[in-house]
Amino acid sequence: MLSILFDDPARTSSGALLIVGILLLRWALWPAPSSHWPLVNGKRWFEITTTKSKDRFVANGKDILLSSFKRLSKGFRLGTDNGPMIILSPEYVDEFRSEDRLCPVKFQAELAHTHLPGFEILSDKHVPKSVFTDFILRKLTPAIDSTAPASVTRLREALESTWTNSSEWHQIDLHSSVQVLSHTTTSPIFVGPELSSSKAWEELTYRYVGNFPVVACSLRLWPKFSQRFVNMILPSCTSLRKDVNQARQMVNEVLQKRAASQAARISQGLEPEKFSDGLQWWQELSGPPCDPACLQLALIFSAVHSTVDLLSQTILNLAERPELVDELRQEIIAVRESQPWGKAAFYKLGLMDSVLKETQRLKPVSIATEDVTFSDGLVIPKGSLVMMSCHNMREDSVTYPNPLEFDGHRFRKMRESPTNGAMAHLVSSSQHHMGFGIGTHSCPGRFFIAAGLKLTLSQILLNYDLRLSDPSENVTQNQGLFLMPNFKAKVEVRRREPEIEL
């Protein structure tokens, strides 16, 4: 039929209209897998597309969510900027935590186009989840103690270049400077001395990590059937592909040079040179094949996006609270004078841990790989995008007295509780706080991220004073369901004389 319609130019227009008509009919009559769940923010009667409803979600997502749970306590469908999602009540967290059929990896693949060239760093094919998790748990986390001293030196140099040594109050670019600090603490550990000292590698990773989420979001605006074609012609997508290919060339060149050097040393009867970085650790792992360049970009992407938001918001919160900064400085000095930086020292930074956990606002998301039926009969259809609501983190006055008030001591005091003490740590997860995910869906890199955050924040607080240029300015902003740092808020800093050298 298609050949009859399109072989004759005179019929092309009517053929196109017929195809569009068939597609619209299918869209209208074929129910989505989760369509029996009530949609709380669909199109209004005079709206043809979902554009306006998505705009309303981005502007008022939090209010829509809270009002909807008052009517539909177990959950509902919410039209988001990423398409319709099932929003579950936190009451299902115990079943959610161990449900393998709710798969965050597939959700990630759905939103990040990981099947397309340029986006493959988050693909399970190029970076298998088992290899990624094994790398973090067996190599990265155990290296926290050994890598801390060098990270301190690099942080000091990065702060001097971005925040300067001026003892006068001056404004900083919070977002870009925190990105620099995040790269500073991770890049040498991930890729070793050859690439971490390369300006080309630094520029590539900054560019790629910054562009990836923006380009992925823009590609989602196109119909799914057209995305593979659009990916090949959109300049921003082309740029991502070029960066991935360049990363492969650079990583492979380092690996080849190391292999040649090691072979030469062995032939001369010398001990092979020992490397302690991600490029070496990757080669020591067993498991399915893994693209080493994609692994490196995935590590950097995950670390930067996990760190920048939380560290930026913490700095904004502390800039409003000089008395809390003084308490944190006293804690840092007491801990550092008693022992060197490492996991044991970071554990003792209880107040800092509490401040970071109080600041944290992240959410776990998944996709159902099969129909999932919970114990009360609630069904999640296969193919549904699912989000576990964390609104109780800000609304639960039983667990969190005065829940809307920032209390830097909240989780430090909770540590002393015989019933809730175990869930009070930054890296802990529970029904009441899912900042790093929950159960089998928890972030495997949370211990490494927490250590890096505490090391960076210690360096900042001992060496700089903080304040907001305009104390009346909001330090957070809502975007859809998420509470984001307000990067338009102007932060000022000045160099101070540290009580001790870290």
Curated annotation (Swiss-Prot):
The lineage of its organism: Eukaryota, Fungi, Dikarya, Ascomycota, Pezizomycotina. GO terms for cellular component: membrane. It holds the Pfam family p450. The keyword Cell membrane does not apply. It comes from Penicillium brasilianum. It comes from the Eukaryota. One of its GO terms (molecular function) is heme binding. The keyword Metal-binding applies. It is a single-pass membrane protein. This is Cytochrome P450 monooxygenase prhN. It is found in: Membrane. Heme binds at C443. Belongs to the cytochrome P450 family. It is an enzyme of class 1 (oxidoreductase). InterPro entries: Cyt_P450 (IPR001128), Cyt_P450_CS (IPR017972), Cyt_P450_E_grp-IV (IPR002403), Cyt_P450_sf (IPR036396). Coiled coil: none annotated. The chain crosses the membrane at residues 14-30. Glycans are attached at N165, N474. Keywords: Coiled coil, Glycoprotein, Heme, Iron, Membrane, Metal-binding, Monooxygenase, Oxidoreductase, Transmembrane, Transmembrane helix. Cytochrome P450 monooxygenase; part of the gene cluster that mediates the biosynthesis of paraherquonin, a meroterpenoid with a unique, highly congested hexacyclic molecular architecture. The first step of the pathway is the synthesis of 3,5-dimethylorsellinic acid (DMOA) by the polyketide synthase prhL. GO terms for biological process: mycotoxin biosynthetic process; terpenoid biosynthetic process. Pathway: Secondary metabolite biosynthesis; terpenoid biosynthesis. Its cofactor is heme.
